[in-house]
Amino acid sequence: MAPSSKSERNSGAGSGGGGPGGAGGKRAAGRRREHVLKQLERVKISGQLSPRLFRKLPPRVCVSLKNIVDEDFLYAGHIFLGFSKCGRYVLSYTSSSGDDDFSFYIYHLYWWEFNVHSKLKLVRQVRLFQDEEIYSDLYLTVCEWPSDASKVIVFGFNTRSANGMLMNMMMMSDENHRDIYVSTVAVPPPGRCAACQDASRAHPGDPNAQCLRHGFMLHTKYQVVYPFPTFQPAFQLKKDQVVLLNTSYSLVACAVSVHSAGDRSFCQILYDHSTCPLAPASPPEPQSPELPPALPSFCPEAAPARSSGSPEPSPAIAKAKEFVADIFRRAKEAKGGVPEEARPALCPGPSGSRCRAHSEPLALCGETAPRDSPPASEAPASEPGYVNYTKLYYVLESGEGTEPEDELEDDKISLPFVVTDLRGRNLRPMRERTAVQGQYLTVEQLTLDFEYVINEVIRHDATWGHQFCSFSDYDIVILEVCPETNQVLINIGLLLLAFPSPTEEGQLRPKTYHTSLKVAWDLNTGIFETVSVGDLTEVKGQTSGSVWSSYRKSCVDMVMKWLVPESSGRYVNRMTNEALHKGCSLKVLADSERYTWIVL
């Protein structure tokens, strides 16, 4: 007889009887046991133990937030984010603003020392995004590098504009622009070093009296445009001490480190010009779309010239291109630019710009580079025009009345940084560290210009380069970062105007196409290498939003196909206030490595 109630059906399914329910229960239990065994077997293959296996296990320690934090802090509006990677600290933040529409938001970040048998102890409080005028509540993300536990980096995303009246009065950014705020803050040390003790003796009673290594703050702000770059902390922070910032116009690699005067172990992190020896030349093989392109750990040989079998552009296309190029040429000469015949020769290579002078203009409308130029070794060595490198040393002023040195000129390329200590004193930037005494903070910036790279790749490596007219928009997604070889693989989605293939019938008018360019950028040399160039896909009736949406989905699929398991400790710890913006709260703050929960 069939069970008459849900409880009877459940009990029948879970019993060991010989009925169908009992057999089904055995099969289900067997499947569950088999699944766990398969997962554990996979550990031997991948070398990584997935924490998902133990998510339903009770934590070793489970405490309530109300029992370890005074109510005054909760009433003050503390939003608790999570545990640090080391498990020693719990982080929270507060945001405050006035009652009127013209007041700014002010953010503070807090470190609380966690102890199972006592209440949380506040050990550090810092103000984020120093002196920035923030008119709306931010999405915050606090991140830690895989192995660098000396500092955290905080991103603030302004995803919606202020109200219309304030925008009109203050001339703020419109819906096509978003502000990104970044603060890098030193983590409180577990104990006081000798330099911290000296600072405490110099400023008795001041909890913010710390040495520079354990007490610096670095702030910057930049603006991104549509299509707004994807936030990818797992890739942007994959290399310790380095953060990759996509500013919509360039990719900026920033390295932050603290050193002492006379430190012989100083090592430049970026752009140290270290390269591996050249590999023997080999003919290129077709790349399967299912396999990830190998990140070049060496400088490959020059790319072959375009085959003679490629279709030649029709006379109408050539005439139209020459007309456009002539207009640009005349405008350049009218402004006192360099004439066409005075330009230096290009060096052969996939990017064709290793020995390019900074002042050389970009190729226009599909101009091709001369393939009979002299070898790169014979050309004068100069930095590629698509790369900018700066290194500044920040030091604390020695006295209150010290006259600052000459102001450093803004190169309009590097991101501006404000560096302070915990007591709010600004650090002065210097280009040379010869006169530095005591501790100093080094900020390196290596910048890759997207538009220059796009023009170079199309000019030298695109089989459809003879059809190209201009590009209208682009979107950059990081596909992989190799911290050992310092290679960054990026995918450039491109909306462009190009003439149709000569084989197509109809009028010779430019059409809108979409394509993608994969490029590997070397953080040691600043040089990029073209990995692959996609075919042209005509955009028919699609909005730019749908084009970028499908492009980013394809990037996600590509990354998931290439995903390689890493050591459980080599991850970027990420804490956000996303739940707050969704109108809800986290249930627990979990330290999965130590099986500790704080119930909210």
UniProtKB/Swiss-Prot annotation:
Zn(2+) binds at residues 193, 196, 211, 214. One of its GO terms (molecular function) is small molecule binding. The keyword NADP does not apply. Aryl sulfonamide anticancer drugs change the substrate specificity of DCAF15 by acting as a molecular glue that promotes binding between DCAF15 and weak affinity interactors, such as RBM39. The keyword Cell membrane does not apply. Keywords: Immunity, Metal-binding, Phosphoprotein, Ubl conjugation pathway, Zinc. GO terms for biological process: immune system process; protein polyubiquitination; protein ubiquitination; regulation of natural killer cell activation. Transmembrane segments: none annotated. Changing residue 420 to P: Decreased interaction with DDA1 and RBM39 in presence of indisulam. The modification Phosphoserine is found at residues 50, 310, 314. InterPro entries: DCAF15, DCAF15_C, DCAF15_WD40. Residues 280-295 have a biased composition (Pro residues). E7820 binds at residues 231, 234-235. Substrate-recognition component of the DCX(DCAF15) complex, a cullin-4-RING E3 ubiquitin-protein ligase complex that mediates ubiquitination and degradation of target proteins. The DCX(DCAF15) complex acts as a regulator of the natural killer (NK) cells effector functions, possibly by mediating ubiquitination and degradation of cohesin subunits SMC1A and SMC3. May play a role in the activation of antigen-presenting cells (APC) and their interaction with NK cells. Binding of aryl sulfonamide anticancer drugs, such as indisulam (E7070) or E7820, change the substrate specificity of the DCX(DCAF15) complex, leading to promote ubiquitination and degradation of splicing factor RBM39. RBM39 degradation results in splicing defects and death in cancer cell lines. Aryl sulfonamide anticancer drugs change the substrate specificity of DCAF15 by acting as a molecular glue that promotes binding between DCAF15 and weak affinity interactor RBM39. Aryl sulfonamide anticancer drugs also promote ubiquitination and degradation of RBM23 and PRPF39. Component of the DCX(DCAF15) complex, also named CLR4(DCAF15) complex, composed of DCAF15, DDB1, cullin-4 (CUL4A or CUL4B), DDA1 and RBX1. This is DDB1- and CUL4-associated factor 15.
